[in-house]
Amino acid sequence: KMRIISVCLMQLLIIADEPTTALDVTIQAQVLELINSLKEESDSSIIMITHDLGVVAKLCDRVAIMYGGKIVEIGTDREIFYESKHPYTQGLLSCITNPEDDSDEDLQPIPGTPPDLLKPPVGCPFYARCQHAMKICKEQLPETTTFSPTHQCACWLIQAKEASHE
């Protein structure tokens, strides 16, 4: 694959779409360092599109988790990695391996298959794979619950929990 980085003077926004996919660790580190230095030197923002949560942890201040073409959770890097609310976000995080972890626990894959985006579901796109799915999840897109000015989640389960605490 050929990778091209195009930078114009006074760039306010850099969009990096899977910039480290299929790169070895050394080249990946160099690409991330370049992106970070471009950000710092030009005082620009970066939209990082990636499946690599390790890259997200190293480079991103704010994170939007998408599933089935919808943002299901958005927050600061700390809120997403340490205070995640959405079942999909929690499932993603449970799939991250820690090389320093000596436990024999197996990774827990998220069961099921992603939705057909040519025929998207009416309700929550994660419904068919969610272990907490309720009837309303299949019927309607969830509204967004705000936990802080920077942390929101779109999930009927979370709304039900929040309502029971009021």
Can you annotate each of these PLM segments?
Residues 76-166:
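Charged, flexible cofactor/metal-binding loops and thiol motifs
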Residues 4-6, 22, 160:
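Serine/threonine-rich, low-complexity intrinsically disordered segments
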Residues 15, 19, 23, 27-105:
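P-loop NTP-binding/switch modules centered on Walker-like glycine-rich loops
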Residues 2, 12, 29, 160-163:
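Intrinsic disorder/low-complexity segments enriched in polar/small residues
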Residues 6-9, 13-14:
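ABC ATPase C-loop
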